[in-house]
From Swiss-Prot:
GO terms for molecular function: hydrolase activity. The lineage of its organism: Archaea, Methanobacteriati, Methanobacteriota, Stenosarchaea group, Methanomicrobia. Pfam families: Lactamase_B_3. It comes from Methanosarcina mazei (strain ATCC BAA-159 / DSM 3647 / Goe1 / Go1 / JCM 11833 / OCM 88) (Methanosarcina frisia). Belongs to the UPF0173 family. PANTHER family: UPF0173 METAL-DEPENDENT HYDROLASE MJ1163 (PTHR43546:SF3), UPF0173 METAL-DEPENDENT HYDROLASE MJ1163-RELATED (PTHR43546). HAMAP family: UPF0173 (MF_00457). It comes from the Archaea. This is UPF0173 metal-dependent hydrolase MM_2300. Keywords: Hydrolase. InterPro entries: Metallo-B-lactamas, RibonucZ/Hydroxyglut_hydro, UPF0173, UPF0173_UPF0282_UlaG_hydrolase.
Amino acid sequence: MADLKITWLGHAAFLLESEKKLLIDPFISENPKSPCSPEDLNPDIIAVTHGHRDHLGDTIEIGARTGCRIISIHEVANYIKSKGVFAEGMNKGGTVEVEGIALTMTHALHSSSIDASGFSFDGGSPAGFVINIGGYSVYHSGDTGVFGDMQLIGELYKPEIALLPIGSRFTMGIKEAVKAVELIEPRIVVPMHYNTFDVIRQDPEEFRKAVEAKVDTKVIIMSPGESIQL
């Protein structure tokens, strides 16, 4: 099993580093909590969970500069390609292997329009990813509410690490995210998508206490720019 380094870049953006570098939802330049600039990032792969601006983020700019491979749901991939940057589409339930990293697209309860240039484009369906990298299974739920088939995700893919939103309003809040942890049963959970803006302000310590009162999952609360090494 190779080493895996996970760095939180604020909001729902993460950099996963093993033999290759995978960047998820690179909302960087407009993210008030971002610890870096898009120019600092040189991923081999970008995975985009859905079309909203705070997730698609700087994907096109980073992709154009680095030539990295971009994976997203079919409609978001088509939008990226319309901007002159190659992207590879997939859909829920499917798995693609890119640079030795397997990405399985999972269900998410959210929306996915792409708002740009005064128009709203079809962004298909929102999604999450189960990522097999460096011998580890990592579940990034994307923006989502809690849903019963999270238990199926846990049974099928057995993610050791879950990256889950707790901000409420647009995603799960703390109560729902705790239930998600119960359903998935990961070894580690990292809360995300909170405190970027006042409208999604939450206390992650409240989440930690609620999780640890119910299950054996370890809660790791990260600061933007902080990394964990597995």
